[in-house]
Amino acid sequence: MPIQVLPPQLANQIAAGEVVERPASVVKELVENSLDAGATRIDIDIERGGAKLIRIRDNGCGIKKDELALALARHATSKIASLDDLEAIISLGFRGEALASISSVSRLTLTSRTAEQQEAWQAYAEGRDMDVTVKPAAHPVGTTLEVLDLFYNTPARRKFLRTEKTEFNHIDEIIRRIALARFDVTINLSHNGKIVRQYRAVPEGGQKERRLGAICGTAFLEQALAIEWQHGDLTLRGWVADPNHTTPALAEIQYCYVNGRMMRDRLINHAIRQACEDKLGADQQPAFVLYLEIDPHQVDVNVHPAKHEVRFHQSRLVHDFIYQGVLSVLQQQLETPLPLDDEPQPAPRAIPENRVAAGRNHFAEPAVREPVAPRYTPAPASGSRPAAPWPNAQPGYQKQQGEVYRQLLQTPAPMQKPKAPEPQEPALAANSQSFGRVLTIVHSDCALLERDGNISLLALPVAERWLRQAQLTPGEAPVCAQPLLIPLRLKVSGEEKSALEKAQSALAELGIDFQSDAQHVTIRAVPLPLRQQNLQILIPELIGYLAKQSVFEPGNIAQWIARNLMSEHAQWSMAQAITLLADVERLCPQLVKTPPGGLLQSVDLHPAIKALKDE
């Protein structure tokens, strides 16, 4: 058989094999087109599980008459126009294959009208060459797509359709997922003339939990823990069910969205599972509805024809970000609720001291009996989030640090307790082990401090470097190694390989685990402070540093790594500065007594005061 160009209909039917798997696939593609058109109301009519009829009606922007024929052509789209658009996709559709593929395996009719047109127009394709016919029609502003007799001309595909009930259940699940992605859109679903689902739009700032409960059920809503987590261009929002109360029915609720696009991503599922693993049994699964917002340039959605999968350019960063966000919410859930007056109070637990940088040490003062006020939880501030806790040699430090930081942001009203004995020393005696109180942030990377009436400036990047060095320096036990989701494989020279082998024991104490072969080294684990770094740059530089050394001391290597790590904060906030100083005072108390050069600089206000008095 000679090589020849396939007829348009046959080519579209081949493409339909990838895009149109079943009626639910058609519904997904058409509803996503409606959302891209800016629709705020979408009505979906299904007959016989979608095999007989699929009708999607929306109130979007519509399609111009001159573009109707192109809309049914293959590789025709208004979503992208250049490679730059493809590398930063913000729409749900972009391939321009859906309508052409669907029309090749069904009888598709497209009716649309724009606000500028006086009348609507209808288009349909037929014949071997998929010629498009356009004629006038009556229709309001928006678009209606009718798909009749799906797979009528491909009997083999039609045989694989399941029962009417099964196919409609798949459609219902797709609509549930879309309704969770777009709370601002009204969606109505009917089957065989009966309305089955009605999801009303939720106004901006409205009660999204109402739609969440309607879709996921009250059982999930009762156990749902809200997530609001942000770091740079990454934002994680949504809900995760309390793992301690997860049931097999709840475990079926696993909805994840990346930039509003529903996904089935193993990396995201792994991060969530890892965060919940201490609270889930071997046969249990977490339940969640999560929304990940990321810079479109950092994610590739052009992976699968049905757009079910994505690839992240910095997969380790995304994995750890999601893991830490879910873990922080679960740790907050472990906090003991405020007891009522008539309830027996549990024995006090050991809580690290509230550091002076956040204000006066109220925990060192006697409690005053006052009426119990309702607990107030401040709304999460946009553009900032609690700093991710670092581990250290002290067991359970992550939880303690998270608890202290949350207490700095939200202090419950004093409890009614018997009057405590007077403290043996002044309440602010902790000043001797503190840098002081953070007043404000100066030039985005310096903290203005006040201690005993004296003012000083502290360089936050320098303090961060000392903290990292302390975190990386092994104590009585080696630094805990964190396995990489995707090991890093690098090509090395003979000299570099020899240096790595000599430094292997020292690197192991720092939590860096690797395996070498003839010409390559594979980094399998790193300490937690390195997980947020660009290892493809840092590790080769570290190998180059080791190749120039003759003695390999863990302390020297930790110092070099700390000096070469990139700062997590381009601009520091008050909360981040307070958390950093709390960590430095805990792990590096010697810096408070004898600050090294470049860390702390006193500010002399006497000239300014004198100038004011002389005026």
From Swiss-Prot:
Keywords: DNA damage, DNA repair. One of its GO terms (cellular component) is mismatch repair complex. The keyword Iron does not apply. Residues 369-397 are annotated as: Disordered. GO terms for molecular function: ATP binding; ATP hydrolysis activity; ATP-dependent DNA damage sensor activity; mismatched DNA binding. Gene3D superfamilies: 3.30.230.10, Histidine kinase-like ATPase, C-terminal domain, MutL, C-terminal domain, dimerisation subdomain, MutL, C-terminal domain, regulatory subdomain. GO terms for biological process: mismatch repair. It comes from the Bacteria. Pfam families: DNA_mis_repair, HATPase_c_3, MutL_C. Residues 378-391 have a biased composition (Low complexity). InterPro entries: DNA_mismatch_repair_CS, DNA_mismatch_repair_MutL, DNA_mismatch_S5_2-like, HATPase_C_sf, MutL/Mlh/PMS, MutL/Mlh/Pms-like, MutL_C, MutL_C_dimsub. NCBIfam families: mutl, PRK00095.1-1. Belongs to the DNA mismatch repair MutL/HexB family. This protein is involved in the repair of mismatches in DNA. It is required for dam-dependent methyl-directed DNA mismatch repair. May act as a 'molecular matchmaker', a protein that promotes the formation of a stable complex between two or more DNA-binding proteins in an ATP-dependent manner without itself being part of a final effector complex. This is DNA mismatch repair protein MutL.
